[in-house]
Amino acid sequence: MEKVLTIDERKVTFKADGATPLRYRAQFNRDYFADIISITNSLKDLNTGEADLSKINTTIFSDIIYLLAKTADKEIGDIFDWYGSFDSFPVFEVFGELQELMMANMQQTVKKAKKK
């Protein structure tokens, strides 16, 4: 699944596939699904006004965004150079736009075989 966004007047493609959780673990040494759940819970708390902003790990947002871009374009350099190539980068806005893409890996798509 892919999505193209315009960031800092550049078109950037983001992609999630079956290997996204594995790449995330290899790149950042953290569990993709655990981080997605953590962020989802933090965002729910923000919406209800009960969030403790000091407990939200904003690095996770940046890491997931970078990984989805790197999955779409293998030529992207390291995370520091990539983010540094933008004059500005609205992390939370971009993250919001990519939620459907991220959640695609968490939805059940395997159908159970029917018994004869």
Mark where each language-model region is.
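Short, surface-exposed, low-complexity cationic segments
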Residues: 18-37
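Short low-complexity stretches enriched in small and charged residues
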Residues: 21-22, 54-56
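Active-site helix/loop of acyl-thioester processing domains in fatty-acid/polyketide metabolism
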Residues: 68
